[in-house]
Regions:
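Core catalytic lobe of class I
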Residues: 1-304, 311-312, 329
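Conserved phosphoryl-transfer catalytic core
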Residues: 310-328
Length: 330
């Protein structure tokens, strides 16, 4: 098994090329134990068949993820959070869903004695229909349009500030703020709504736990608008094409990474992604002024991920991950 190496760095972070189990044994990484404010990652999904981005399958996936729980949690600061994005899974050759992602989550939580702070849904109606056999061919199931995001921590009240990810007010709320009145008093539910509790403009509304960052969504946090559009992914894809390497087939939405980085950390904090893929997490952290540490086992994805960083790089010796070199025409 290869020794993990630093593939590239910026002033704020480094990308390691290697498996997470080995990377955590490196002295520079071990020195960060107890100092990571947020681990945000999307482990390879527990698909029924092996994909080219290195996923485990079946029971092996559960044991693998469970085995990482303690060593990853040890990296967290006392008030740090670990956030896992887990997709849905289906039984092999069957239009029935697998409970493996939930079983793996529970095994991970129990192994590290974590608190489950909240369950968040990331909705993306633009996702391709899947599983294709049961959705588009046999038409027996509905299109899968969301992933689960599980926020956990070592303590019940980890560092968090929902004020950092406020969403725009609805038209009704804007009208209420303008007229400065509403129907206060008792509700059938038993709640007693005060006469002034909703009259203060706080700059936006508290985000719900169903996130939708698609182009037609009208309630994207204003602090994340700079991540909207396709520009972030276009630069990455163009770089991969120039380097003649394949793009990652299951890239994370940069808006999702940025949301949790803004929500759970402050500028200068340390963000870690142990399954970095195209290093969406690292690039979002860089843009938001957070320090970052990313780890990826597949060399081709490490090479391509450099395309997310533009001119942020600091000098590295040699050609550590086989990056395509420009021809010398002298």
């Amino acid at each position: 098994m290869r020794v993990p190496t630093i593939a590239y760095s910026t002033d704020l972070g480094s990308m390691y090329h290697g498996r997470i189990e080995e990377a955590l044994k490196q002295n520079k990484v071990k020195a960060l134990r107890g100092k990571v404010d947020l681990i945000f990652t999307s482990p390879p999904f527990p698909l029924v068949t092996k994909k080219r981005y290195g996923n485990e399958t079946g029971e092996a996936y559960l044991k693998w993820l469970e085995g990482l729980a303690v060593i990853l949690t040890d990296m967290l600061s006392p008030t740090g959070s670990i956030v896992l994005e887990l997709g849905n899974a289906w039984e092999k050759n069957s239009p029935t869903m697998s409970t493996l992602p939930l079983e793996a989550l529970l095994a991970f939580k129990r192994a590290a004695n974590l608190h489950l702070c909240q369950h968040v849904i990331c909705h993306n109606p633009a996702r391709l229909p899947s599983p294709a056999a049961w959705v588009t061919i046999n038409k027996l199931r509905l299109k899968d349009t969301y992933t689960h995001v599980w926020w956990m921590s070592k303590v019940e009240r980890p560092k968090a500030n929902s004020g950092n990810v406020l969403v725009p007010y609805s038209k009704d709320m804007l009208a209420l703020l303008k007229r400065q009145s509403y129907n206060a008093g008792k509700r059938p539910s038993g709640h007693d709504v005060s006469a002034t509790g909703f009259l203060t403009d706080r700059g936006g509304a508290i985000s719900g736990n169903v996130l939708d960052f698609t182009s037609d969504a009208d309630r994207v946090p204003s602090s994340l608008l700079k991540f909207a559009g396709t520009g972030w992914d276009t630069a990455y894809r163009n770089y991969c094409k120039a380097q003649d390497v394949e793009t990652h087939p299951a890239r994370m939405q940069i808006d999702l990474a940025a949301f949790f980085i803004k929500f759970l950390t402050t500028e200068g904090n340390l963000v870690m992604d142990p399954f970095a893929g195209s290093n969406t997490t690292g690039s979002a952290a860089e843009e938001l002024g957070r320090k970052w540490l990313s780890i990826e086992a597949e060399e081709r994805y490490v090479i391509g991920s450099k395309g997310r960083f533009g001119n942020f790089f600091t000098p590295q010796s040699g050609n550590p991950v086989g990056e395509k070199k420009e021809a010398n025409h002298e």
